[in-house]
Amino acid sequence: MIPVLVTCMAVFTGCGDKDNDFRDTWLGTYEGYCEYHSSTGADHQFDTVFTNETLTVSKQGDEGLVLDYLSQSFQVRCSSDGTFTSTSNNPHSEWNGCIKGDSLFFNYQDVSQGHSTTRHFKGKKKVSSKILN
């Protein structure tokens, strides 16, 4: 019982500390590639495509993040260890992932009407270039 209490308090303290928001280091644009799987037709054969893509991370509320990816916004709940999960109530879609150092991993799955789509994004944080005078 004590380890659970300590864990809960650590997460609560980290999320509630307005002056030291652990999410600040994760904000920005990540460049990488996506491994995309999509079932086609009734036989559910999968096509796999690799594409170069970007994903942008911004804050939402006290504990959330928004991932802007492929013209969609994915709202997630995050933990101070970098893991995040979907906040959606849609039973056909789910997403999760983690941010470790300057790397972001994002998994998305949508299953509806016999069609399945899975995306695995892996990216590195883009470093902004500044011109020094």
Protein language model regions, located:
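N-terminal helix-cap/turn-to-beta initiation motif at the start of protein domains
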Residues: C15-E31, K126-N133
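Amphipathic hydrophobic-ligand
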Residues: T48-T51, N89-H92, H115-K122
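Short, solvent-exposed loop/hinge segments that bridge or flank secondary-structure elements
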Residues: R23-L65
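Short, solvent-exposed aromatic-acidic interface loops
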Residues: E35-S38, D68-S73, D110-Q113
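Edge beta-strand at a domain terminus
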Residues: S80, N107-N133
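Sec-dependent bacterial lipoprotein signal peptides
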Residues: M1-D17
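A short hydrophobic beta-strand element
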Residues: Y30, I99-Y108
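Contiguous, well-ordered beta-strand patches that form the walls/edges
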Residues: T54-G101
